[in-house]
Amino acid sequence: MSPADAFTSGSRTITPPSRPAPSDQPAWNTQKNSSMPTFRYRPFAEEVEPITLPDRTWPDKIIDRTPQWCAVDLRDGNQALIDPMSPARKRRMFDLLVRMGYKQIEVGFPSASQTDFDFVREIIEDGAIPDDVTIQVLTQCRPELIERTFVACEGARSVIVHFYNSTSILQRKVVFRADRDVIKKIATDGARKVLEEAAKFPDTDWRYEYSPESYTGTELSYAKEVCDAVTAVIDPTPEKPLILNLPATVEMATPNVYADSIEWMSRNLDRRDSIVLSLHPHNDRGTGVAAAELGYQAGADRIEGCLFGNGERTGNVCLVTLGLNLFTRGVDPQIDFSNIDEIRRTVEYCNQLPVAERHPYGGDLVYTAFSGSHQDAINKGLDAMKVTADEQGSDIGDITWQVPYLPIDPKDVGRTYEAVIRVNSQSGKGGVAYIMKSDHGLNLPRRLQIEFSQAVQRITDGEGGEVSPKEMWDVFAEEYLTPIRPLERIKQSVQAAEVDGGTDTITATVKVDGVEQEISGSGNGPLASFVDALSTIGYDVSVLDYSEHALSAGDDAQAAAYVEASVTSPTGVATTVWGVGIATSITTASLRAVVSAVNRALK
């Protein structure tokens, strides 16, 4: 390979591996050893004492019931964000978790952050915590931090105080420079302190959780020793158990190793009948879900995680994936995932991070078949479902789901069949999205691609053959750009707020069914102001998603704006559609996109 053919990044160059392969490598395997510095790393069994469990039972277990969930989005998830949640975003996330059915929610680290402290006070004083929901707060074992944690929670009905300290070989050596006895004493002193502080607030039902942080890097015998010492101090009972949380703070080995450690701990911990054994897997090796499922099979009772796997580095285990994995095997997750798009939109708003298009169950592409053979199998599977339902005198939604390539009925999580089998039926000829971008400069959002593909499909179904780029543009313009009934925007004037975060006002001239009138409104930006103005003439519009981009460079460049909106008709029926606007002004383009959505919803 010549230097010009190499991929470079900084001082590194990607070159084909060429070092000799192991002598026992089969002849049919032509791979060679690379020049990467493998010598700098070592097997897990050389870093932490190996686990011996020849009579393990977890491989034969079947998951047939749901664990106790604890959502840690507001603490572990929030601390990993580039832009940590504002109070409003935290409240929106908390309310979502409550609506979905989570009964244990870690709401912050109040002793480490004034923002977290204030949020805990807010949800307590506002009465936002339902009686059957227990909040959880995290604290290190330092006395002053524990004291402030309890002050933050004063007045709450039920609270889990989650205290922790790191116990791993590496952290004992390089962070604390302390021996095992010192580290254990930190844990037991913390346990005594939480009991002492709890006595000052007798009106709250206090529960306790202890984590030997970096558990996966800790000798099992020592992890048990520390956990048993904490248990002895807390003195739990079967009626009021202690939560012992065994986190894969850093995922260090294959999931079966984690499962072995959980089964060993479950067998050997003191007073197991008074212990709730909890898991907290991270995803450093990409196997967080597998580790959680195998660890649960191995004897755990409870799992902590985040929606869509947000969290430090590669994230916490994904509660959506875990819950819907149970659902697809006939186990009720005891959580409502029936509107996966609303859940995703809320999580994306709160985290200010996108959910990957291939993320299990929630990504834009997970119910999409691009392959013709896959589409054919899905079509035949759906047809077979209809036949079976008719034979049984039932609806498809009432019979066992069996469709190739789709482990779940998209409708059960609020998706549609059209998005599955229609989205890219012409992709062999270039694809709707590719043509719209390469020929017309429009970078359509994924869900708009799905919606517009259906319009293209109607043309191909009716006329047959291939749709040319010009024909595709004509369909797009007719669908999104040219309709002016019932609503047409003529002009607008925007008065921007004088300070950041202020309120903009808009005055616009519009035609409603051809009759010109002037409207005005206010909001956080021109788009929100225009939506507010439309409400004064009977148009109920809620913007769900918005994006924009320039179509070219230069001072006179046009911009494209895309709005996904819920538009409620005069009869009270809400329709979710996309609207598109193109103009030299991005403000005008965005308002045209709203008008486009209204006209499409009400046509």
Question: Which positions does each model-derived feature cover?
Answer:
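Alpha/beta enzyme core
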Residues: 39-41, 69, 85-103, 120, ...
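Short beta-alpha connecting loops at secondary-structure transitions
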Residues: 132, 171-172, 246-248, 276, ...
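Catalytic alpha/beta core domains of metabolic enzymes, predominantly
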Residues: 250-388
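Short, small-residue-enriched loops and turns at beta-alpha junctions
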Residues: 76, 80, 110-114, 168-170, ...
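Conserved structured catalytic cores and adjacent interaction surfaces
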Residues: 559, 584, 595-602
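A mid-to-C-terminal "edge-of-domain" accessory segment
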Residues: 17-75, 330-520, 555-558
